[in-house]
Amino acid sequence: MRVSQTYGLVLYNRNYREDDKLVKIFTETEGKRMFFVKHASKSKFNAVLQPLTIAHFILKINDNGLSYIDDYKEVLAFQEINSDLFKLSYASYITSLADVAISDNVADAQLFIFLKKTLELIEDGLDYEILTNIFEVQLLERFGVALNFHDCVFCHRAGLPFDFSHKYSGLLCPNHYYKDERRNHLDPNMLHLINRFQSIQFDDLQTISVKPEMKLKIRQFLDMIYDEYVGIHLKSKKFIDDLSSWGSIMKSD
């Protein structure tokens, strides 16, 4: 085994034998790994075994089996997220999305930092629905999906009232609408936002203000994109879909 010091985000844990746990952690430098924690309920690591906990870990890495946690410090527990069902549901979804986007034991520091920053912004109170949309758009390439939301697939002009074409897997400008009789007839303003989401840097993001009607259009479009081009169906996504139907009863103004 080798020793590695790295930041990590706990994805989930599950019971193993009587009092042990298997804990999956997405680390910045070692990728996603499964860790064995003996006597977890009595372990000094119990505080950092919960999902959506970030810490600086000292790890014993086994490339051919289970790894071990040696120590930890600098714990970030996302108290605001964990105290709000809606924030927690969306945070759990993007975490699950990151989990399925890459293989185990493969380092992806860029994705780790992106996920960590997204969670921090949700914790800070920025719009969790739009942050989730941005995460979904920028994660598409991890699934091998390269869609251009910037310019027309035929003439490459930008800044026009575009529509999306499944036939050409891209945007059509008004001069080329005729190329696809089954184009989606989408709101061009929504596609403009999707284009911005594709390239936005979180360091530049101070506030988010998107009307509910536009949020719904974005949600429906991204659901369509993920269904057709990615094809994954996560339990955490179904849960946030259900929130839209019954969650308003619980949501405070």
UniProtKB/Swiss-Prot annotation:
Task of the protein: Involved in DNA repair and RecF pathway recombination.
InterPro entries: ARFGAP/RecO (IPR037278), DNA_rep/recomb_RecO_N (IPR022572), NA-bd_OB-fold (IPR012340), RecO (IPR003717), RecO_C (IPR042242)
NCBIfam families, per the entry: reco
Record-level GO cellular component terms: bacterial nucleoid
Pfam family of the protein (one): RecO_N
Protein name according to UniProt: DNA repair protein RecO
Gene3D superfamilies: Nucleic acid-binding proteins, Recombination protein O, C-terminal domain
UniProt keyword list: DNA damage, DNA recombination, DNA repair
Biological process per Gene Ontology, one example term: double-strand break repair
